[in-house]
Amino acid sequence: MSDTADRVKKIVVEHLGVEADKVTEEASFIDDLGADSLDIVELVMAFEEEFGVEIPDDAAEKISTVSDAIKYIDENKG
């Protein structure tokens, strides 16, 4: 597992209060991890801060799974 994946999963566990073993790359933030729209906004902000990337609203709307977040961050981080 990549460093990005580990860090994304850690943020998800901290922000959503879910068990780490539930945070798989295929997990949907809403359907599998119980996030609501406010949680998603907070996760996106945490990803931006942690990785120094900007995630515009149109891109954030397409990030629905853990792997979506990892892929976006890997493709856009400095």
From Swiss-Prot:
Instruction: Name the cystine pairs.
Output: none
**UniProt entry keywords in alphabetical sequence:** Cytoplasm, Fatty acid biosynthesis, Fatty acid metabolism, Lipid biosynthesis, Lipid metabolism, Phosphopantetheine, Phosphoprotein
Post-translational note: 4'-phosphopantetheine is transferred from CoA to a specific serine of apo-ACP by AcpS. This modification is essential for activity because fatty acids are bound in thioester linkage to the sulfhydryl of the prosthetic group.
Write down the superkingdom of origin: Bacteria
Under SMART domains, the record lists: PKS_PP
Intracellular or extracellular location(s): Cytoplasm
A GO molecular function assigned to this protein is: phosphopantetheine binding
Q: Which residues carry this modification: O-(pantetheine 4'-phosphoryl)serine?
A: 37
Q: Does the keyword Glycosyltransferase apply?
A: no
Q: Name one GO cellular component term.
A: membrane
Quote the InterPro entries the UniProt record gives.
ACP, ACP-like_sf, PKS_PP-bd, PP-bd_ACP, Ppantetheine_attach_site
Q: Which family does it belong to?
A: Belongs to the acyl carrier protein (ACP) family.
Question: How is this protein named in the record?
Answer: Acyl carrier protein
Organism of origin: Novosphingobium aromaticivorans (strain ATCC 700278 / DSM 12444 / CCUG 56034 / CIP 105152 / NBRC 16084 / F199)
What gene does this protein come from?
A: acpP
